[in-house]
């Protein structure tokens, strides 16, 4: 049986559209999103 698993390329601290485009160009499969919560 073939027990190989895929390798995922993760991008950490991707905080702008420019960075997302850059990382995708480098082979990014998924990215970490940093969310900010504000009190009103």
Curated annotation (Swiss-Prot):
Its cofactor is Mg(2+). It is found in: Secreted. Its EC number is 4.6.1.-. Keywords: Cytolysis, Dermonecrotic toxin, Disulfide bond, Hemolysis, Lipid degradation, Lipid metabolism, Lyase, Magnesium, Metal-binding, Secreted, Toxin. It comes from the Eukaryota. One of its GO terms (biological process) is lipid catabolic process. Dermonecrotic toxins cleave the phosphodiester linkage between the phosphate and headgroup of certain phospholipids (sphingolipid and lysolipid substrates), forming an alcohol (often choline) and a cyclic phosphate. This toxin acts on sphingomyelin (SM). It may also act on ceramide phosphoethanolamine (CPE), lysophosphatidylcholine (LPC) and lysophosphatidylethanolamine (LPE), but not on lysophosphatidylserine (LPS), and lysophosphatidylglycerol (LPG). It acts by transphosphatidylation, releasing exclusively cyclic phosphate products as second products. Belongs to the arthropod phospholipase D family. Class II subfamily. This is Dermonecrotic toxin LgSicTox-alphaI-1. It comes from Loxosceles gaucho (Spider). The lineage of its organism: Eukaryota, Metazoa, Ecdysozoa, Arthropoda, Chelicerata.
